[in-house]
Amino acid sequence: MRLLLVLLALIFSVVSAQQNTCAQLCKDNKDMCCSLSKNSEYLLTTHNKEEKTQSCGDKFNSEDYYVAGSNRFGCGNSVTICKVQSDDSKIEITPNRRFGHHGGGVAGSIANAASSISSVANSVSSMTNSVSSLANSVSSLAGSMSSSGSSSSSGSSGSSSSSSGSSGGGSSGGGSGGGGGGSGLVVGKERRFGKHGGGGIAGSMNSAATSLSSLASDVSSVASVVSSLSSSSSADAGSSGAQGSGSTSGDGNAPPGSTGGTGGSSGSSGGGSGGGGGGSGLVVGERKFGHHGGGGVAGSIANAASSIASVANSVSSMTNSVSSLANSVSSLAGSMSSSGSSSSSGSSGSSSSSSSSGSSGGSSGGGSSGGGSGGGGGGSGLVVGERKFGHHGGGGVAGSIANAASSIASVANSVSSMTNSVSSLANSVSSLAGSSSSSGSSGSSSSSSSSGSSGGSSGGSSGGGGGSGELLSQNQVFATCVRVISTNVGPNVDIEDKIGKPIMDASTKVCEDLFGSPYCQWTDNHIVTAVSSKLDDGFPTQGAFNVTRSQYGYIMENGHYLNNKGNSVRIN
């Protein structure tokens, strides 16, 4: 009897152990586990597709989502599967950087900061070219206003004003615009930071900040020069109002219809040809931070954040200067518009009674300014995603990088504001060019010539070159994704026997969401990528959702790539 009781107890313990096996294996994320989400439309099941083997006795149904192969996603993990909408089949994804044993996303964070600084550098470089071009335009206008219409006292008695208005006043060709941008900020070769981190991050980031600060100083200097030119032009505008005060043409003895004067090409400024292209941006090599990744990184990045904040202040100050300059030029345009009204002084055709004198006096085509063609495309934008700092968190690194990102965002906003100010300035200068082109067209000839129609044909400035233009497509749908939950794990499958591709299949619902078909078309020309992910990353947990390129990159870079070799799972 005692033996029977022992046997019963042994059998009971074995049954209990078997019942606990599934839960324990799921908890330990082993090769076998039980289904955790039977009621979900989005389930991922890994097993041998050919044999249809399953774990824990769960019944396979048509709504399960499964992948042939090993336990590459584990049990109960969330997996994001995305189908790229673009026809580009060569989308390259850069995985997270790893920094030794405890690693983390420090590299990705610094890379994002570097990319943002590069974008700001390109924007400011483009702005420098635009302001330089505007400076040349204003300088040309200053020259044309100072000499416009100075030959209005045409023709002595009997000469029928033959050379009247033939002055080429202000026919400056304008500036050629800014040159091409520099080669950008290049930060050395690969850095190695030893066993416990620290190293030259501060030097790299501070070098970038110093370069930006110098660039801001240069643009501020250009703004001061343009402001000075604006003041000079304003003085010229005040002194030009007395031009062409009536012609002293012939006494009536001249033959009718004589040469009449050409009317001049006064004010025919060609304007600036616009700025050159931006620089190549900031290149930061791979960083390795040793065993613990910590060290002096936080302090280094904090110093960089402080430097970038200083740049933000400089750019903000420069924005105010350019805005003030825009107002000054706008006011100058208004004053010039009224001062140029004396250019019709050639209409006093009281001489040469036998001719059709005065019929075309002052017929200048003033104000035909072409205006500026506008700036180029925008920069690549600022995208700051979630930072992960590994097992030990990296101390104050997160706060330091967050401060740096905030400062960079401030710079980006300031540059954006400055862009608007410079755009306003360009419009004002264009208006100024039109206003000043009518002054100096002193075609006071009293002959029958109708020439003089080319006065003031300013070409304006063509604007500077833009950045990479990435913002233009920032909000476009790049991929469609679904979230699934891994439920079952079965025996391994040699994916090399499957032409190197993991075999994937899915429920009808998922296929319809991804491909618009009851069957998943894994062999089409679009890339389908699966990565494990977390449900708390802000993306929907049920149903298909669209993502932009930057969001897709975030999902891929922050996901955990897994296949039987620990690499990315990719179809096609």
Swiss-Prot record:
Keywords: Signal. Residues 145-165, 231-240, 326-358, 433-452 have a biased composition (Low complexity). The keyword Nucleotide-binding does not apply. Residues 1-17 form the signal peptide. Transmembrane segments: none annotated. Residues 145-199, 231-297, 326-388, 433-469 are annotated as: Disordered. GO terms for molecular function: lysozyme activity. Residues 166-185, 258-282, 359-382, 453-469 have a biased composition (Gly residues). One of its GO terms (biological process) is chemotaxis. Belongs to the dictyostelium lysozyme family. This is Putative lysozyme-like protein. The gene is alyL.
